[in-house]
Amino acid sequence: MPLYEHVFLARQDASTQQVEELTTQITGVIEGLGGKVTKTEAWGLRSLTYRMNKNRKAHFVMLNIDGPSAVVAEVERQERINEDIIRYLTVRVEEHEEGPSAMMRKADRDRERDDRGGREGGGFRGDREGRGDREGGGFRGDRGPRRPREDADTAAASEE
């Protein structure tokens, strides 16, 4: 039977429990039509690149499906009807990826980075305080002191 990867996005105001119920419902439809769900991953509530149906965030869920195309057609029909599902995408693949998907590996890597601790001084790279001996920033090097500034009246008189 053909293999598919199916991802759907649920509304941001749906609870995690509601998203799990949606996943169970979709899995039931797949298994009822002779398909099989080999892997389910909930990627959690993530920010969207742009607003979709007034949502700035969505719950992402991925399913690996092993079943005929009629299963995918019915799942997509059910998702079109359901108001909690914003978007969905089904892609046919040659084989399912073993282990966690790229999104789950990225989430694990991000968690590891957070565990490393903060920077010394407690700030992020954007804080530029305490740089050099001058107030507000940078090292002046071998530049001498500034020349006195000409007044606007003096500059206008020298041009004439």
UniProtKB/Swiss-Prot annotation:
- Listed GO biological process terms: translation
Q: Which UniProt keywords apply?
A: Ribonucleoprotein, Ribosomal protein, RNA-binding, rRNA-binding
Q: Where is this region: Disordered?
A: 94-160
Q: Which InterPro entries match?
A: Ribosomal_bS6, Ribosomal_bS6_sf, Ribosomal_S6_plastid/chlpt, Transl_elong_EF1B/ribsomal_bS6
Q: Does the keyword RNA-binding apply?
A: yes
Cellular component per GO?
cytosolic small ribosomal subunit
Q: Which domain of life is it from?
A: Bacteria
Does the record bear Calcium in its keywords? Answer: no
Q: Where is this chain compositionally biased, Basic and acidic residues type?
A: 94-119, 125-152
Q: GO molecular function of the protein, one example?
A: structural constituent of ribosome
Protein's job: Binds together with bS18 to 16S ribosomal RNA.
Similarity remark: Belongs to the bacterial ribosomal protein bS6 family.
Q: Indicate what this protein is called per its UniProt record.
A: Small ribosomal subunit protein bS6
